[in-house]
Amino acid sequence: MIMILYWSLPMILFILGLFCFVSNRKHLLSMLLSLEFIVLMLFFMLFIYLNMLNYESYFSMMFLTFSVCEGALGLSILVSMIRTHGNDYFQSFSIM
């Protein structure tokens, strides 16, 4: 019974994070927050999986390191976008 709770809670939160990521497409900051929530739930599921199989947690630490680098890169893009355009709306941001 506890194993079902270990797997169902992160999956529900992962799906909730995906829903927030898809529904908040106007602001870059809300997209970055929901993306970090998704990565955190993936880390939690990976940690549970590795502990169930009695593996070492070095891979989860590497995953956490790369997710921190991804978050820092996203925040730097957000800061540069706000400096050039004045806001974080995707409507005012043009790739061309």
Swiss-Prot record:
Keyword Isomerase appears in the UniProt entry: no
Pfam families assigned: Oxidored_q2
Keywords for the protein's UniProt record, in alphabetical order: Electron transport, Membrane, Mitochondrion, NAD, Respiratory chain, Translocase, Transmembrane, Transmembrane helix, Transport, Ubiquinone
Cysteine disulfide partners in this protein: none
EC number from the UniProt entry: 7.1.1.2
Catalytic activity from the UniProt record: a ubiquinone + NADH + 5 H(+)(in) = a ubiquinol + NAD(+) + 4 H(+)(out)
One GO cellular component term: respiratory chain complex I
Lipid biosynthesis in keyword set: no
Enzyme class, spelled out: translocase
Membrane-spanning residues: 2-22, 28-48, 62-82
Any one GO BP annotation for this protein: mitochondrial electron transport, NADH to ubiquinone
Job of this protein: Core subunit of the mitochondrial membrane respiratory chain NADH dehydrogenase (Complex I) that is believed to belong to the minimal assembly required for catalysis. Complex I functions in the transfer of electrons from NADH to the respiratory chain. The immediate electron acceptor for the enzyme is believed to be ubiquinone.
Family: Belongs to the complex I subunit 4L family.
Full protein name: NADH-ubiquinone oxidoreductase chain 4L
Organism: Drosophila melanogaster
